């Protein structure tokens, strides 16, 4: 199978759909992996890394997607330039977000291409190997707290000094999904007093399990 890896064009998007390590596995399995030049640069993976893995480096997007095959990306195509070249012989896989951004999925469908949105894969043991959303949410939950700690005008942990005691910061995390639970765990490790809130009754025990009040 021909597998195309396109460069992400979203503002601030630094991810790439397939790493050189994954490309090497796919090539070894007999697939033809084509990577758009610069696709992994923002993630610290250059064209030489992909070339060493056996992938072909294409100079632009048109040459990358070709006339048929599987096209993988993190975010789905969002404009006419990104949609150009898709045909009924293409299969698009990525985080297309059809619930909140139905126009993107509709635009892909209008080209005749088949699309699969990985953000709709259920969180189940059977589908765990395809659950890219949970890994992304884990990173987001961690980074959210680190950013908050940087911007917070006080220290996170309790500090007892000769000059006095500094009470710990108090954080409230709304939502106890993957990102929320990771945010709670990160804040607890930084020494904050954390409370979690979720409308789901079953989430209360999960909130307590990572050390927060519910």
Pin down the residues of each PLM region.
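An N-terminal-biased, well-structured beta-alpha scaffold segment characteristic
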Residues: 5-107, 111
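Short linear motifs at secondary-structure transitions and domain/linker junctions
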Residues: 7-10, 46-49, 65-71, 122, ...
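Acidic active-site catalytic centers that drive phospho-/nucleotidyl reactions
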Residues: 69, 119, 198
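Glycine-rich phosphate/diphosphate-binding loop of Rossmann-like nucleotide-binding domains
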Residues: 6-42, 154-214
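A broad detector of short, well-ordered amphipathic alpha-helices
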Residues: 66, 139-142, 146, 181, ...
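Short Asp/Glu-rich motifs
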Residues: 44-46, 69, 126-128, 206-207
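Glycine/serine-rich phosphate-binding loop and adjoining beta1-alpha1 elements at the start
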Residues: 2, 8, 81-170
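Short, hinge-like loop/turn segments at secondary-structure boundaries
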Residues: 50-54, 132-136, 211-214
């Amino acid at each position: 199978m021909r597998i195309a890896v396109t460069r992400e064009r979203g503002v601030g998007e630094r991810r790439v759909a397939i790493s050189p390590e994954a490309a090497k596995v796919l090539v070894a399995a007999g697939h033809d992996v084509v990577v758009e030049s610069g696709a992994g640069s923002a993630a610290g993976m250059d064209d030489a890394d992909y070339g060493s893995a056996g992938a072909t480096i294409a100079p632009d997007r048109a040459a990358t997607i070709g006339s048929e095959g599987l096209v993988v990306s993190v975010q789905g195509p969002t404009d006419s330039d990104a949609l150009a070249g898709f045909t009924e012989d293409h299969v698009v896989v990525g985080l297309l977000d059809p619930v909140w951004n139905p126009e993107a999925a509709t635009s892909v469908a209008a080209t005749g291409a088949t699309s699969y949105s990985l953000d709709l894969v259920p969180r189940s043991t059977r589908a765990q190997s395809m659950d890219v959303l949970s890994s992304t949410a884990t990173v987001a939950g961690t980074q959210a707290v680190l950013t908050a700690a940087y911007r917070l005008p006080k220290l996170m942990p309790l500090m007892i000094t000769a000059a006095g005691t500094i009470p710990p910061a108090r954080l409230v995390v709304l939502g106890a999904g993957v990102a929320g639970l990771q945010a709670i765990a990160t804040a607890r490790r930084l020494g904050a007093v954390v409370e979690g809130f979720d409308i789901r009754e079953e989430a209360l025990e999960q909130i307590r399990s990572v050390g927060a009040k519910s």
